[in-house]
Swiss-Prot record:
<keyword id="KW-0812">Transmembrane</keyword>
<keyword id="KW-0597">Phosphoprotein</keyword>
<keyword id="KW-0479">Metal-binding</keyword>
<keyword id="KW-0150">Chloroplast</keyword>
<feature type="transmembrane region" description="Helical">
    <location>
        <begin position="98"/>
        <end position="118"/>
    </location>
</feature>
<feature type="binding site">
    <location>
        <position position="163"/>
    </location>
    <ligand>
        <name>chlorophyll b 4</name>
    </ligand>
</feature>
<dbReference type="GO" id="GO:0046872">
    <property type="term" value="F:metal ion binding"/>
</dbReference>
<comment type="subunit">
    <text>The LHC complex consists of chlorophyll a-b binding proteins.</text>
</comment>
<feature type="binding site">
    <location>
        <position position="180"/>
    </location>
    <ligand>
        <name>chlorophyll b 2</name>
    </ligand>
</feature>
<keyword id="KW-0793">Thylakoid</keyword>
<feature type="binding site">
    <location>
        <position position="102"/>
    </location>
    <ligand>
        <name>chlorophyll b 2</name>
    </ligand>
</feature>
<feature type="binding site">
    <location>
        <position position="211"/>
    </location>
    <ligand>
        <name>chlorophyll a 5</name>
    </ligand>
</feature>
<dbReference type="InterPro" id="IPR022796">
    <property type="entry name" value="Chloroa_b-bind"/>
</dbReference>
<keyword id="KW-0934">Plastid</keyword>
<feature type="binding site" description="axial binding residue">
    <location>
        <position position="97"/>
    </location>
    <ligand>
        <name>chlorophyll a 1</name>
    </ligand>
</feature>
<feature type="binding site">
    <location>
        <position position="78"/>
    </location>
    <ligand>
        <name>chlorophyll a 1</name>
    </ligand>
</feature>
<keyword id="KW-0602">Photosynthesis</keyword>
Length: 264
């Protein structure tokens, strides 16, 4: 009865007669009606969206800012620096984060996978990600997957031109539309372009957006770590991992940070 009384006294029911509330079956008593409606609301709710979403406010934030309402995926209510206070800046940064997260996920896979295959007997010529590009300046040029019968690149200018044309076309279609029709949302599949049907189920699609942004953020941190490893150790991520597992005392971030001398 206490729960029912609270539900009836909330702003949701203010100024409304209880008898007007819809129900799938005949009920008796105000308490039962209010409890059914409350349960339905919780059932369709998501832990990742809305005011009751999962939050991380950090050590310097007492409460979530008013402009972070949980409308977008990845909003944990934390913005100590006020980066999202301006709506236009927030929209721009949100797009940049999603796009960079996707590239980082592809990049992290591209850094690890060739090295993994090379360590299992597959010949790549050069499997370490930050050394691979320099092969284009070698006599034999850069061979895709180490196979001369595939893409055989010998001109860095030609690669640059292909990248500009292909990536520019894809980005142009993403923002302004293309042969498939107008763009519904420049950030996510849907409308004329959704070959996998990801947007067919709205609830599942909303959850996929959260998974994407979380994995994208992790991938961006991973890529930053790969860059630091390349500068400090001159090795790929899997080789660094193998060295750490073989000798964790001498091969770790603290050991390298205290002994690292730039240029040596």
């Amino acid at each position: 009865m206490a729960a029912a009384t609270m539900a009836l006294s909330s702003s949701t029911f203010a100024g409304k007669a209880v008898k007007n509330l819809s129900s799938s079956s005949e009920v008796q008593g105000d308490a039962r009606v209010s409890m059914r409606k409350t349960a339905a609301t919780k059932k369709v709710g998501s832990p990742w969206y809305g005011p009751d979403r999962v939050k991380y406010l950090g050590p310097f934030s007492g409460e979530s800012p008013s402009y972070l309402t949980g409308e977008f995926p990845g909003d944990y209510g934390w913005d100590t620096a006020g980066l999202s206070a301006d709506p236009e800046t927030f929209a721009k940064n949100r797009e940049l984060e999603v796009i960079h997260g996707r590239w980082a996920m592809l990049g992290a896979l591209g850094c690890v996978f060739p090295e993994l295959l090379a360590r299992n007997g597959v010949k790549f010529g050069e499997a370490v990600w930050f050394k691979k590009g320099s092969q284009i300046f070698s006599e034999g040029g850069l061979q895709y997957l180490g196979n001369p019968s595939l893409v055989h690149a010998q001109s860095i200018l030609a690669i640059w031109a292909c990248q500009v044309v292909l990536m520019g076309a894809v980005e142009g279609y993403r923002v302004a539309g293309g042969p498939l029709g107008e763009v519904v949302d420049p950030l996510y599949p849907g409308g004329s372009f959704d070959p996998l049907g990801l947007a067919d189920d709205a609830e599942a699609f909303a959850e996929l957006k959260v998974k994407e942004i979380k994995n994208g953020r992790l991938a961006m941190f991973s890529m930053f770590g790969f860059f630091v490893q390349a500068i400090v150790t001159g090795k790929g991520p899997l080789e660094n991992l193998a060295d750490h597992l073989a000798d964790p005392v001498n091969n770790n971030a603290w050991a390298f940070a205290t002994n690292f001398v730039p240029g040596k």
